[in-house]
Design a protein with these regions (language model features):
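ATP-dependent carboxylate-amine ligase
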Residues: 1, 155-156
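Short functional linear segments
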Residues: 1-46, 53-64, 71, 107-114
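Short, surface-exposed alpha-helical segments at coil->helix boundaries
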Residues: 4, 22, 96, 204-205
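Residue-level signal for inorganic ion chemistry
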Residues: 10, 47, 68, 140, ...
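Residue-level preference for the first positions of well-ordered beta-strands
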Residues: 41, 137-138, 193
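ATP-dependent carboxylate-amine ligase catalytic core
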Residues: 29, 34-37, 63-155, 171-174, ...
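Glycine- and other small-residue-rich loops at beta-strand/loop junctions that grip anionic moieties
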Residues: 46, 120, 196-198
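Conserved catalytic-core segment of NTP-binding enzymes
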Residues: 145-149, 156-205
């Protein structure tokens, strides 16, 4: 498939898939060979400033000589913007190669009776495969929507960051700041540190 055909295929995914559980995403990574293993992942959620925080973290790590992968969404012009390696968008050639490797895993998933990954899951899988192929040490992940049930929460980070929280995506995350904060806080775990931006009183209670 050409680059253009691949992008068209990915854009069509929402038409024939539905939201999956985190277990489905973990199964997907299993078929991919668990590219997330051995990576130092920093997970970022919040309402405002997620993209900026991710960019700062990526730049700081590279300034210290670390190899980095950066996964953000949405893209503005080109799908490659979502998958960044050492400060540079993935090339069209590498994008195509990673797509083919991911599709091979997806076909094996479907043969095993599992559903096709969603649009976001598919791009997340491609990103993690790209970072693994390139031998990236650190990966900065921006949540797509919320946190608790977001596909990016299927991997184990070394740290997480929650930026300021406000009213957003209320049709999915809840009608109040407290409910939305609960969804965002779903990225917090017991085995790693969480860095929290100063929040409204309703969020921190």
């Amino acid at each position: 498939m050409t680059y253009k055909e691949i992008v068209t295929y990915i854009e069509e995914i929402p038409r024939f898939t539905r939201k999956h559980s985190l277990d489905h995403t973990r199964e997907m990574f299993l078929f991919l060979g668990n590219p997330q293993n051995g990576k130092k992942i920093i997970h970022v959620a919040g309402t405002n400033g997620k993209g900026s925080v991710c960019a700062y973290l990526d730049a700081m790590l590279r300034a210290e000589g670390k190899s980095t992968g950066l996964f953000t969404s949405p893209h503005l012009v080109k799908m490659n913007e979502r998958i960044v390696l050492n400060g540079k968008q993935i090339s069209d050639e590498d994008f195509c190669e990673v797509f083919e490797e991911t599709m091979q895993a997806v076909r094996r998933m479907q043969d095993a009776g599992l559903e096709h990954p969603t649009f976001f899951e598919f791009l997340f899988a491609m990103a993690m495969k790209a970072y693994d192929r390139a031998g990236m040490e650190y990966i900065v992940l921006e949540t797509g929507l919320g946190g608790r049930l977001d596909a990016t929460s299927s991997v184990e980070p070394v740290a997480c960051v929650i930026t300021s929280i406000g009213l957003d995506h209320m049709e999915y995350l809840g009608d109040t700041v407290e409910q939305i904060a609960g969804e965002k806080a779903g990225i917090i775990g017991r085995k790693f540190r969480c860095f929290l931006h100063r929040q409204h009183r309703e969020v921190t209670l």
